[in-house]
Amino acid sequence: MEPHPASRQTPAWFWFAALFALILLSRLPFIGVEYGQEFDAWRVARAAQHIAETGEYETSRAPGNPVQEIVCSWIWRGGPWAINGASAFFSAIAATALAAVARRMGCAHWWLAALAFAAVPVVFLGSVNGKDYLWSLAFVMLSICAALRARPVSAGVLLGLAIGCRITAAAMILPLGVMLLGALPRAARIGGIARLVLATFAAGLAAFSPVLLRYGFGALTFYENLGRPTWKAAVTLGTLDVFGALGLLGMLIAVGGGCFRLLRRDPLPILQNALLTPALALMAAIYLAAYVRLPHQAGYLIPFVAAVILLAARWSPRPAFLACAGCLLVAPFVSISRDGLGAGCIFADHAQRVQNTASLRRFLEFAESLPGHNAIVVGAWEPQIAVLAPELLHGHNDYFYTLDEKELAPLLRAGRPVWFMPEIREFNLRVNRLDLAHYGARDLRLAR
């Protein structure tokens, strides 16, 4: 199947550049308000500032995402516009690389596949905050492009950079290996796979060297116990929070169309790489299984979304895929609920960021008015305080993310009043196995 008709008159690079610019521009109205609702995004900003000011590497959270943290340390003075803007930049790279893969698969609407992917709510939201999801995926998609061109060393280096942004990208070594098997002649397959593995290991090790030199290999096994949501919550997080109601409808249309096509046994364009479709299915299965194991954040499924969009572009009949893409393009801007149509997730996220910052400033005004030198456990607000008001973090009061026994004991010996936010008591118990109230800490509501 030929590319989009317009590309017959205009070089392909022009359409890729236009696609990149369009996706990047669509993010700009939403990147200037703080670093996002997820506190890990604030941790990235905090670590970037520390690295820039001290020259010493500090992870935002174990096991770290050193490529993102170090690059952000070069631009952190630009605030949300710079750090969120970098996420937007990498989201445009990821979508453009996805378009290149779709085009190589013979998809007539490869450009629409990229736009649909970029509009998936979880992707759009991830591209306007400080999280690492789209940084990693950009390098993953570029590594796929390299593998399809039978360039195992380039694919491995790019995958190593993806791992340096998000360690879970290491799982892509299997799908990339399958793609290389289909791209290389039989005699070159063993050597190609070996070069892929060695290049990935070398690049990944180099990317993670700041973490290993500072914290040792123990940092790679760290896991913060956030608890497991109910299955109902996990399903909602993995469906509606990923695609939105309209986007989920679109994906169901695409799946239905693909099943109908299989039943009719309609012919598909012959792929240059016969193993590309199985490799994408493997990619989707790996990241879906990883999410099922730890269903904490919808963003974990972003690589799954990329694979599924490509499979839909390949297998769905043209009307079904156009309907799917249309639903996805609208999904971040319009929501559907029992109350009817409403503002989409991207507008709700923007408003919630403004509200969260206002709430934090009101809280700090109250907390700083308390008498004495207090220790206050604030959970996710701790990195936000460190970024927005670093002079207050250890000033009149000390603000902590959580407290363990070693941290709590000297506070109690010094006679310091210890307070906790209402929802933090249970969180601290789950993470540190320590009930703050049992040791004399008090609910901050009692101070009002």
Model-derived features with residue positions:
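Membrane-embedded, lumen/periplasm-facing catalytic core of multi-pass transferases
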Residues: A52, C327-L392, H396-F400, D404
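Transmembrane-helix motifs of polytopic, lipid-linked glycan transferases
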Residues: A21, W81, G85-C107, L142, ...
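Transmembrane signal-anchor helices characteristic of membrane glycosylation enzymes that use polyprenol
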Residues: P11-A41, F201-Y215, L288-A289, V330-S335
